[in-house]
């Protein structure tokens, strides 16, 4: 079948969804998008994503690709995203849809991803961020947290910070190129960037860093926890609702990609 391939950038509020994937129980974001495509293009059966976000996790830069039968595509390319959004719920939006090379694959061509995690560090929660940030009311030592964050940069086995799932690859080794902590008012933003991530890895890292800031995990022990490859000795898993898949990187350099696309504001500067 002669098809046209499109690269999609998708944003969604993950609160109401059981993650990205189509689910046997509950609803995945993928299911809603495929249903929208099905109403417009009966020949489209599936979209392929760059990532699989977990239940309650959000996205501003999920990338996917889709192949549309050429015979069914009767609109200007620029109208595709608008047309899809007309069939999507308000908590899912296609930000862009552009033609992609025939060989492009959203997952296998990705060179890295950036996640951001938001914490509201004040005794009173900001009600506007209730579903977007983890409320942690205890005072935190940011200097120790930043020092600990630097220890994650580089190539490591991240087994100590990840959950387990049957689809995980045999290797737990990943390379992080960035692990920063920014502060804007009462909001803390963790920026974690790397070539790939294990299941719940970002949330395990953030939970551990918060416990370092709280004084429950000594800074001196973080390197030992990383080397232990034992989830039981690391910190807690941060809640899902503070995590956002911010960006997926492809062939161009990560810095130029990040500069070329501005993201919607999410309650504070990163």
Residue positions per predicted region:
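Structured-RNA-binding interfaces characteristic of tRNA pseudouridine synthases
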Residues: 1-255, 263-270
